Amino acid sequence: MGKLFGTDGVRGVFNEELTVELAYQLGRFGSHVLSEGSHNPKIVIGKDTRISGDPLEKALTEGIVSVGGDVILAGVIPTPAVAVIARELGADAGIVISASHNPYQFNGIKFFSGDGYKLSDDVENHIESFILEKKEVESHPTGTVTVLEHPEKIYLGHITKDFDCDFSGLKMVLDCAHGASYSIAPEFFVNGGAEVVTIGNKPDGKNINAGCGSTCLNVLCDAVVKEQADIGIAFDGDADRCLVVDEKGEIVDGDKLLHLIGVKMKKEGRLKKDTVVVTVMSNIGLDIALEKADCKTIKTAVGDRYVLEEMLNNGYNLGGEQSGHVILLDHNTTGDGMLTALVFLTLLKEDGRLASELSALMTSYPQVLVNAKVSNDKKKAYLSDEVIQLKISEVEKHFDGQGRVLIRPSGTEPLVRVMIEG
């Protein structure tokens, strides 16, 4: 990671760490780097529902057209849709304006390459060097700006091509986090024949992720029970992650989704190398459940970009995180909340059992996770702190091999996450 780019693009509080001036520079120099300065780049821009999305979109666009780039505006749309659209339209890049699950005060700018993958550290560092070293590029004739009509059709056409999308007989509650999926998701599932109750679908620019969505499931859990629904589906602000609530109002997290999807793919002969790629934060119960199905796990550092790197480098096609980032490389190049929901609902209908019965096929070990606020410059101080290291050793000795302590700095926020599992 550099000084500007974190684990998921450039992110910060709008008008503090992330300004319109920085957005202009990212648009200008990002376009230059991604087109290698050899042609007029074509770049797709999408965003979520944050109030700061419009000024950042305007600044990015101005930066891109200033080096002769042509901008295609996809409007409010899920992050994974931008990856699909960029690829389908033959663009040089896609840019998403979103801070994912963070509050509305934050925003972010994330690049996808023309083939729909997040940029490598080397490419991000190259873009960053232009900004930090105040480099310049040659002037070009001004590029063009086009508003893309019905971008959702391109996205949905791609992720649904291998599924029949018949949700008839299912009653579901959708929580769209007042974010990017607020319109596209309810319409999609209704068109598939489901009875849909939707919450979190009235964005006002400031309520994204506020007491709703995949990071705050209480309202959805209650709604599923109250509505006597078969299932609840929660997305985060940019809909690149998905979590599920069963008919009893209990959470089915990303680990359990990976278990169910992985076992199904294994039975169908589609799970490459019989392996699911997860992170060090995944529950021990996932390892045990997958082992019973003759599947293996490979663990990476926390962050879907590291999961994806492992998948691409070693030929795996399923991976993800407990938080609900699920990467299904047979269908998309990045974590995709709506795709994950589609795959799980297809599994649910084909299996015939209740969601709670499927969830019970994996037993999760108890985990306690605490977020400690720590300034960015001190997030790794625990590594050399003798008192902290001694306490970790004492706790793990007490578990006698049946538990662990994991401390990791957040890649997107001034936090250190402390997890105890056993």
Residue ranges and their predicted role:
Residues 71-80, 251-254, 278-279, 300-301:
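Active-site nucleophile and cofactor-binding loops and adjacent substrate-binding regions
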Residues 8, 45, 82, 95, ...:
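Buried hydrophobic positions in well-ordered alpha/beta secondary-structure cores of metabolic enzymes
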Residues 32, 36-107, 187-245:
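N-terminal small/polar loop signature for handling phosphorylated ligands or for N-terminal nucleophile
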Residues 39-48, 72, 171-173, 275-280, ...:
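Short glycine-rich phosphate-binding loop at a beta-alpha junction
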Residues 1-62, 66-68, 145-170, 379-380, ...:
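An N-terminal, well-structured beta->alpha segment
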Residues 231, 268-422:
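Phosphate-binding and adjacent anionic-ligand microenvironments
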Residues 13, 107-227:
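Gly/Ser/Thr-enriched, mixed-charge loops and adjacent short helices
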